[in-house]
Amino acid sequence: MSPTLTHLALHVPDLDACIAFYETFCGMRVIHRRPGKGSQIVWMAEPGQEQRFIFVIMPGGQPRNLASDDYSHFGFALSSRAAVDDLARRAEAAGCLVWAPRDEPYPVGYYCGLRDPAGNYVEFSYGQPLGPGSEALPIP
């Protein structure tokens, strides 16, 4: 078997705020909690993806201070441009919108970006050749 990416592990300054962010904006759910080294370790996953890919989040990290033109991010696919616009509106109301919706040439597509409570950027896109529903799109 070749290596398979199964998780990303992140230390975050405010565990509860990060859980709420990923539940609210990404549709992820806590699937596991346990004590760990004087704190708590939490696993989060998208419904149906629990055994494929998870975020492991733990308290204790420092906030990331990324520049607005730093494109380091986690990427999530959405079902339509309207879904990107709706999510961007909700993020703007919550004060976490970093990149307003914009169009880029293929394979980037239509996307917006949010800042999670730890300072990580999270992209929400439509029209990329990645994720559910993209099987008919060519890989560039």
UniProtKB/Swiss-Prot annotation:
GO terms for biological process: response to cadmium ion. It comes from the Bacteria. It holds the Pfam family Glyoxalase. InterPro entries: Cadmium-induced_rsp, Glyas_Bleomycin-R_OHBP_Dase, Glyas_Fos-R_dOase_dom, VOC. PROSITE patterns: VOC. Residues 4-127 form the VOC domain. This is Uncharacterized protein PA2024. The lineage of its organism: Bacteria, Pseudomonadati, Pseudomonadota, Gammaproteobacteria, Pseudomonadales.
